[in-house]
Amino acid sequence: MNTKDFLLELGCEELPPKCLQQLSNAFTHNLTTELDKLKLSYSSVESFATPRRLAVLVSNLQLQQNDQIIERKGPSISAFDQDIEGFAKSCGVAKNVLVQKTFGKTQYYFFTKQQKGLKTIDLLESTVDIAIQNISIIKPMRWSNLDTYFVRPTHWLIMMLGSDVVPASIMGLASGNTTRGLRFTGERIFDITCAKDYQKILLERAQIEVDFNTRKEIIRKQVIQVAKNNNAIAVIDESLLDEVCALVEYPRAFSGNFSSKFLDVPEEALISAMKSHQKYFHMLDVDGNLMPVFISVANIESSNLSVIIDGNERVIRSRLADSEFFWTQDKAHTLESRLDKLNQVLFMKSLGSMGDKIKRIEIFSGYIATVIGANVKDSARAGLLCKSDLVTDMVGEFADLQGVMGGYYALNDGENKAVASAISEHYHPRFSGDSLPNTSEGLAVAIADKLDTVTGIIGIGQGPTGSKDPYALRRMALGLLRIMIESKLNLNLKELISKSLNENSSAVNINSVDDIYQFMMRRLRAYYKEQKVNIQVFEAVLAVCPESPYDFHLRVEALNTFTNNQAFENLIETNKRIANILKNYSNLLIKVDDSALVEVAEKALFKATKSLSKRILNSTNYTKNIQELIAFKDIIDEFFDKVMVNTDDVVLRQARLNLINWVRSLFLSVADVSHLSL
């Protein structure tokens, strides 16, 4: 089979950096999908992406389709002649050309023909065109007088098989083998002589590294080295690194300075200004303090680097001066004095203003504080003030600083440290893997705020549907569960949901407790799935409806401890045996008339069950409880070996059924292990 490497490069104006990887992945996926549809084989695929180009290299692409036997099934041989003639005509042949074949138990007319495989070079134009058009673009652009759309205007197109150009015209561009280097330095235009050497040629001729991940690691190493040169430690945010990588083709990292006077501004504000506006990396000294130095990555090798550094220093000086101004202006007004402004900020239609929300948070934070042992006064105070920073200049400019700046402003206002910390951390966890609030008061406010949002929005019928979650309630619910589980808070979730609903807006359906609880349980399922917990373990615990997510977690941990434990597997089988006996009976009790028992084995089981019940029913040491149940198994087995449950004596039968129902209740005190098949 003859093969050649196929190169596709689409040259564009600067692509949106935050979606460059997504575009590259879609570009590659769509192309390989179309090649697969054409049954064209290849050995491997490489994706390349820079700010000005998307490229794919398909190695050892089959140069011609294999010949195929095309077969069409027609009417049965007993069909009307006109139907058979019509089928033959649709195939472009006479009736006598059709063949008869048995399909199932019936004979049908079939038309078969051999279709010669087409040359790949003749298929690539339409294949590439479809691949490009199928890229999902939220905000497409039009340019020139062309009736085409793309994320940015396109300027050149390379399509090559080996060293040969594939003739094509796509989006008004004629294919060729000419690419472009950097805009302002080096070779501006040059040819790709061979598809497989694409990456090498661009690197040698224009110093452009087209592989995204390779370029990313180059930037990482350069940033680390620049930090070392400044006797500092670079803080590399992966999302910022991805964005910077999507902004440069020829990365050259350098450092610049800003006045140390700006260090009087909270460091989070300085870092946010450097990251969001300038795409700078910040540096810390050996003690972890922010240094008045930044690292930027240029897209050019300059003979006069000082000019670039000076320009960046002037820009960051202006940005940090703005942050300093916001900080000074905001401190002139207390958080409490801003409460009235929150009445003009809409939280959500039907749920009132932010002013309404903080009143609910204040009350609910105080309640939760009493339950978890936090300071009630500080928790309520933090709940009242936790949203005031939303109307400050700093948070208006840097939305990611909400909460953080509130903590600083609280300290400036003379609020105590517990209140300030709770305000600062009440949004946590903000994303997967984020830290939890560190203080009890912060936990109380975080729970109150998140529950108010989740119950309110779902309570007015605006909860997530399918893949749509416009208010990020799934993430918020997961954060709530993480707080309760990882902070070891034994809180009754249904009770909290009910209380939150009753304190919410009058538009909220207070009867949606079960719906919200089930929503939370689906998020808990996702939480354990991410942790690779056997889904049967989750279902076994869910079946006994623990009131507290933390208690739920303790049960899951206990069951996980006994995975692949033969003694536990035997216990599961015993439980299933009991469940099978009891499934045909209703209205059974766990109160046993022991005076009706006659056999030694059943009396022994009664005595052991009574003793075990006292030890485990109020215990949350579920690992120990399971160990006790495993030790209990021999007594249960002895009972089944020596005693007939379904005796003719009605009173005795009822006593025995109640006894094994009592035994089953001990199993259910941990989980419904009938869901397990470990």
Curated annotation (Swiss-Prot):
* Any one cellular-component term (Gene Ontology): cytosol
Name the enzyme's class. Answer: ligase
* Alphabetical GO biological process terms: arginyl-tRNA aminoacylation; glycyl-tRNA aminoacylation
What are the protein's UniProt keywords? Aminoacyl-tRNA synthetase, ATP-binding, Cytoplasm, Ligase, Nucleotide-binding, Protein biosynthesis
The yes or no answer to whether the keyword Iron-sulfur is present is: no
Question: Where is the protein situated, by its record's location annotation?
Answer: Cytoplasm
- Superkingdom of origin: Bacteria
Q: Which SUPFAM superfamilies match?
A: HD-domain/PDEase-like (SSF109604)
Keyword Ribosomal protein recorded: no
> According to its UniProt record, which reaction does this protein catalyse?
tRNA(Gly) + glycine + ATP = glycyl-tRNA(Gly) + AMP + diphosphate
Alphabetical list of InterPro entries matching this protein = DALR_anticod-bd, Gly-tRNA-synth_bsu, Gly-tRNA-synth_heterodimer
Gene Ontology molecular-function annotations: arginine-tRNA ligase activity; ATP binding; glycine-tRNA ligase activity
Q: What Pfam families does the entry give?
A: DALR_1 (PF05746), tRNA_synt_2f (PF02092)
Cite the EC number.
6.1.1.14
Q: Which residues cross the membrane?
A: none
Record text on subunit structure and interactions: Tetramer of two alpha and two beta subunits.
- Give the family this protein belongs to, as stated in its UniProt record: Belongs to the class-II aminoacyl-tRNA synthetase family.
What protein is this chain from? Glycine--tRNA ligase beta subunit
Q: Which gene encodes it?
A: glyS
